[in-house]
Amino acid sequence: MAHYAFIDENNVVVEVIPGRDEWEIVDGITDWEAYYTTKREGLRAIRTSYNTVAGEHITGGVPFRGNYAGKGFTYDEDLDAFIPPQPYPSWTLNESKFVWESPVPYPEVELDEDGLPVASYVWDEEAGDWFEMGA
């Protein structure tokens, strides 16, 4: 089953729906993006891959359009990819993984005997660094 993102005039995703696979032909319809575009006035439908995250296909297939689209994501026509919202102004887009990266890498996390993290961190935009939660 394919999925389609509806984008507005600013290329922002407003809705994602399941739909027909691109190889299906029903009632002579062969272009499902064009078909679904006719179903939402003022919006454009673009196929998205449920199995694509951060530029990789999670089951080993071919990644498609950077990320599975989500509401609020932006479709970048130059990259042909769905980009999540920028979490902080200081973060920059990794154009090969299609994700935002902090200016300071996430700290290495120690794991306990059960393999669970002993600490987690939160980004502080004003300080420009990660801080341990609960510390």
Descriptions of predicted regions:
Residues M1-A135:
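Interaction-interface detector
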